[in-house]
Amino acid sequence: MHTTRSSGASTSLTTPGRLLCALAGVLLAWLPQSGLCQQGSSLPNLEPFDKAVLEVMRKHDIPGASLAVAKDGRLLLAKGYGYADKDKQEAMTPQTLTRMGSINKTLTAVMVLKLAEDGKLKLDDPVLPLFEKAGIAPASPADPRAKDIRIRHLLQHSGGFDRERSGDPFFQPRLREIARRQGVSPVSCDAIIRDSLQEKLDFTPGERFAYSNTGYCMLGRVVEIVSGESYRAFSSREFLQPVIGKGFQAASSTESRPGETKYYPFPGEPLQRGAPGVSNANVPSPYGSYSVENMDALGAWIATPTEVLKFFLAIDGTRGKRLLNDESLRAMRSEPVLAKEGNPRAFYGAGIHVVRSDKGDNWWHTGSQPGLQTLALRTRQGYAWVVAFNSRPEHAERRAFFKDIDQALWGAANAVKEWPQGDLFANNP
């Protein structure tokens, strides 16, 4: 580990807490061409990753980012770039907490697969009887096909819910419609399940893929019903505490937690109507336009990229306590059998995206909510990285934004001439 200023190399400082970018002369490394500070630690030869993140931030006007990079289970880089809070000039650090968005879904999938591994459920069990037993399901679902929704369908986003057709119940305007129909405020995950089952499905379960927050809300309740514990308690005790040394931390809809970054709407974004039961005012989109509290199984997790990286490396035992056995890993990375899609080489397995090749699999998940974009990736070459940004562009530019992130980090990995030895995990708890 080395310290060099104005060269793209990082400092060796790993003190927890927020630091002022104004103290750069003492504490932070600067890239003069970008004007952005960076703080954290890395082993030699990884400057291409600094350049990659800073270029994405500059191109898309992102205030802050945090990155953790590993190879073969060893942490090689943990850094923050730019600002966690621009107004206060507080630097993003490796210890800065960020919302992880839909990366949370991978945690939920691992929990479900472990319950199946332990004989507590079967992936082809129907979910409706569980919800009926728990008093969540309506007395008579509107669509008879609801009885055919299986746990496996929900894991693979083929449960019959398509937000492109019927809207996403976790965001407005459908969130507000559910509050009115169900007579609840704020809108809970249980209310969303009940309302979804009182509507016609968008397609027959198992027919095709359609990314669905509703499905993972349902899986969170399956975990609670089968385990007999709350989602947060079960995830903390069985999965997070043994791997990252602390339990599930949940975001707040209306403010950042202590040690958490501030989130920024895209430049020029107007204020949004507050979500039912969250805010009666017009608000910046990251703070009150939706309810994070009802997303525990699909997008409420706050953590550092290093912590999420530890979790991803533990799934197959590359580092730390192994979370899933071989059979569960095969289920996680198996192609879904979908009537209209055949067997593609790129697909969504159970809680992860997979690209299959003759040399092995790459698997990952992304997260995107107002004010944030995240990516967690494992590759067949042994590389792994988790990155979080505290803003995202307007809707029309988001696909290009993610493409730029993905290409920049792959380009950085390919530009490393010699991967260093050593492991920084001990310095980055």
Describe the role of every protein-language-model region.
Residues 71, 104, 127, 252-258:
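Short, solvent-exposed turn/loop segments enriched in Gly/Ser/Thr/Pro and often Arg
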Residues 44, 48-55, 102, 107-111, ...:
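Extracytoplasmic/secreted proteins, especially bacterial periplasmic and envelope-associated proteins
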Residues 58-66, 88-153, 203-214, 296-299:
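Short active-site loop at a secondary-structure junction
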Residues 80, 91, 99, 126-130, ...:
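Conserved beta-strand positions that form and line the central face of beta-propeller blades
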Residues 48, 92, 184-188, 368:
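Short secondary-structure boundary/capping elements
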Residues 85, 139-362:
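Short, surface-exposed loop or secondary-structure junction motifs
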Residues 38-79, 224, 236-237, 272-429:
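Catalytic loop of the DD-peptidase/beta-lactamase superfamily, centered on the K-T-G motif
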Residues 2-6, 11-92, 98, 114-121, ...:
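N-terminal leader/targeting segments and the immediately adjacent pre-domain N-terminus
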